[in-house]
Amino acid sequence: MWRFDGYPGRYLDVCLSSGSLKEVQLDKQTLLNNIGGKGLATHLLTTRDTTDDEAYDLKHPITGDADPSIHPSTPLLLMTGPFQGSKVGSSGRAVVCTRSPLTNIFIDTYIGGDFGHDLRLAGWDGLFIHGRSDSMVRLEIEDMEVSLQDAESMRGMTTWQCEKAIDADDVFSIGPAGESLVRIASPITAGRRAAGRGGTGASFGAKNLKAISVTSTGTSRVADDTQYLGAVKKQRQKMGENRRVGDPFYRFGTSRGPIYAAQMARMPTINYTSATGAIFQNGQKVKQLDTVKLSGEYWHQAMPEAKQSGCCRPCPIACEASHRPSKGKPLHIPRTERPEYETLAMLGSNLGIDSSLDVMDGNDACNQFGVDTISSGALISLVCELAQRGWFPEEWAEGEINGTPAFISLEGELIAWEFGNPKLPPLALERLANPSGMFTILAGGAVACSRWVERETGHLATRLTAHCKGLDLPAWDPRGKRGNAMAYMTCNVGANHMRAGYKNPTGIPNSSALDLIPELIYSQNESVIRDSMILCAFASGATPDDVLVNAFNGITGDNASIEDLHLRANKQWNAARQWNVEHWLKIGVEARQQDLLSYRLRRDVLPDGPAAGMVSFVDDADESACLSEYYNLRGWAHSS
């Protein structure tokens, strides 16, 4: 079934307009040159982009800008890498890559679980999907047998309902938000594994593709068992050591983040008006959120019956936990997952909520309806701040509670747009998934929504958003954190916290990051290697370069050095950038301007904590110098 060591050597071309399903074979050198995963997806997207020029005639329903992302001809890719189908720890991954419906530029976003392994073991490096079906369909893959099945009866189903309805090893589906082209929609697998960023659920919906299911019986093929298994053994030994010494990550995953992030002034609070959990009104601190109560440690104390709920295959870390609640829980949830840090912050502290138990309902709503937790938190916090400032458009209000604008939930309850209201996130997301009234504007995401409000009311709503290139900021505030802003600004997808890291990410507060630029570029290329193999970022510490290289070479038969892999990764990083620049040229905007962070992060200082009084750079001159140095080292023109 596999044509080469380490690679099935083929992808499935799916034309939804015609119903055509074709095997497209890849040569071994192309596979090695692009590694796999993100690298292969980038290569295919940038060299085999099927987007018609007429796609630019489509206009975004809220902003009026060119909107080629949801045109039928725009391709949607789902790819695996050499580590899928292997025993390499923490390799339960797959990448979704397309033109983002949220930002209209390059997006790569990742899922955990078993889907990536099973797709590869079924005999496919990945999927290249284009066109649009006249009716709702689903793609069924059983090893090399592939078919399109009618899915009209599944229209309107949540992702949980889809997974229950389809008999397969793995199901990857959208909920009603994706069907409704909500620009922050996410496809979901295993009930809670989201391809979260960039609105790729709307990419599925625009193609009338409800789900992809995979069943596999195949086995992998490796070049050198001794080299490959030796690398796996070293990785497992390191992971075992970490567990034995009590590394809390192995028990709590990212959910301990609120405690650390608040101490370091990195945790978004009340729509990025603070970063320590402190709430301010008129310049005065009025409340301190309980970050311990918001953390996963409290979640476990409150739910002693909660258990480690398994892991992505195969992963010794097993960083998640779940709880099966009693009957009568809102939204009829069969099992509740412990939220990740990004969710605890964006649907917690960012909304003035400081209980991880309250955040669960919002998290589960995101998983059911298929929306991104980060962008959901950004959107809801924007609307709450609009209401707080008196900038809430009159035509949006469906009622008031004590003078605060409110909406009517699907159950008929009036819900106020106010910070600190734990009922707000799940019920607002339920309305967003099937948008009507004001929710048709909210469906565009926070940035598009702020632009609409500014255009229609004159209020400077765009100054209230935290983003780069239209992608909502993750739950790590860059102000006063040396080099963090540059990592967000130079990332091809927009603000993303998983594409770069520094050995000392905090450094000296409010000092220039100019000397960190070489390290930033190296780290970005390193992330391309990891995301092409594909390896979970949580395993990076247990997978040093020698282990990574030996695992890759042992699986594929290549003789690559880490330097070779960095050269390949650098090429892919630049290819994605060039693809973005070509888009910006078509719509008449300057690339350098697109790289800048939003107003809130460049102009609004933090009010307290170790970064009090600081913004994302020392000053505008420092920002410009850092960006120019980055362009120089990347070999980019200063205007691109």
Task: Specify the residue positions occupied by each region the protein language model found.
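Basic, polar low-complexity surface loops/patches
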Residues: 1-292, 300-305, 368
